Amino acid sequence: MPTVDVVDLNNQVVSSVELADDVFGAEVNQSLLYEAVRQYQASLRAGTHATKVRREVSGSGKKLWKQKGTGRARIGSVRSPLWRHGATVHGPQPRDYAYKLPKKMLLGALRSALSAKVRDGELKVVQNFNFSDHKTKNAMGALSKLEAGRTVLVVDNEDNRNLELGIRNLKGVTLLATREVNPYHLLGHKSVLISEAAARKFSEALAK
């Protein structure tokens, strides 16, 4: 089991915690990470794109000129796809891009993402995030002491109003509960600050 130092909000080591080896020390599966990120990004797509078919395009349905005798090409309606400002044939229509991955794949991708962060030294276990108040200035100071990068993912296992209010206006900082964490979030932030309680929760929930 990998042993990780636990620091306080002043970045001083106060203890250590043993984390599950198959959660925080697993082999990183790049293919699983790719599939998990692709699935999450697909779920974010609005899918509101739309083109107009003949029945939706503005314009008369009257035949512009007689079928024969003019020497011109025959035409039925200005809404024809052949005409400028006419309809679109086989164009995109609103759709839902979301799809599901097997639970086993998602859990495996989460283990890979956590293990990659530990391997690269980008995950830090914090004793707790018990701020004395909800001031953004104090939250920013704590993150600075913890040597957080430009993009930071903060993971806590419990409701923490002071933490939520303190960091919500900080650019590049995201707060999530353990149940909300996705491989996309872990890989999308340079630093991950995780509370000791949340680390233990991951070890219990994701252990094989």
UniProtKB/Swiss-Prot annotation:
Any one GO cellular component localisation term in the record: ribosome
Record protein name field: Large ribosomal subunit protein uL4
Transmembrane segments: none
Molecular function GO terms recorded: rRNA binding; structural constituent of ribosome
Subunit field text: Part of the 50S ribosomal subunit.
One Pfam family of this chain: Ribosomal_L4
PANTHER family, per the entry: 50S RIBOSOMAL PROTEIN L4 (PTHR10746), LARGE RIBOSOMAL SUBUNIT PROTEIN UL4M (PTHR10746:SF6)
Source organism (scientific name): Solibacter usitatus (strain Ellin6076)
Stated family: Belongs to the universal ribosomal protein uL4 family.
Coiled-coil blocks: none
Function per UniProt: One of the primary rRNA binding proteins, this protein initially binds near the 5'-end of the 23S rRNA. It is important during the early stages of 50S assembly. It makes multiple contacts with different domains of the 23S rRNA in the assembled 50S subunit and ribosome. Forms part of the polypeptide exit tunnel.
GO BP annotations, alphabetical order: translation
